[in-house]
C-alpha cells in the first residue's frame, strides 16, 4: 500500500496561549532553545507540508523534531521548575 507514517515533534510554538507567557519565565524558556525563540505556526506547517509532499516520498517511520535545536542542546528539567 506504500503508506508513509511520520511524526512531527514540535517545539514551543507561538500561539495565543503561549503569547500570554511574559517576563522571566518566557525568557528562561527561550534561552534553552539554541535558536533563542519559540517557533512560528508557519514553521510547523511548512514541516508538515514537507512530510506530506513528494519531496519526502522516501521518508517513512521518522519523527521530525522541529524544535530550534532543543533536543540537540539537551533537556533541562530546571526550565520547568
Outline where the language-model segments fall:
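Short, small/polar-rich loop/turn modules that mediate ligand/substrate recognition or access, typified
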Residues: 2-4, 59-61
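Short C-terminal tail/terminal secondary-structure segment
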Residues: 60-81
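Short, flexible catalytic-loop segment of classical short-chain dehydrogenase/reductase
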Residues: 9-20
Amino acid at each position: 500500500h506504500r503508506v508513509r507514517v511520520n511524526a512531527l515533534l514540535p517545539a514551543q510554538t507561538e500561539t495565543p496561549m503561549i503569547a500570554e507567557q511574559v517576563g522571566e519565565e518566557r525568557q528562561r524558556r527561550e534561552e534553552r532553545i539554541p535558536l533563542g525563540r519559540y517557533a512560528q505556526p508557519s514553521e510547523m506547517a511548512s514541516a508538515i507540508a514537507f512530510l506530506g509532499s513528494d519531496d519526502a516520498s522516501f521518508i517513512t517511520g521518522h519523527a521530525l523534531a522541529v524544535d530550534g535545536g532543543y533536543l540537540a542542546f539537551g533537556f533541562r528539567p530546571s526550565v520547568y521548575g
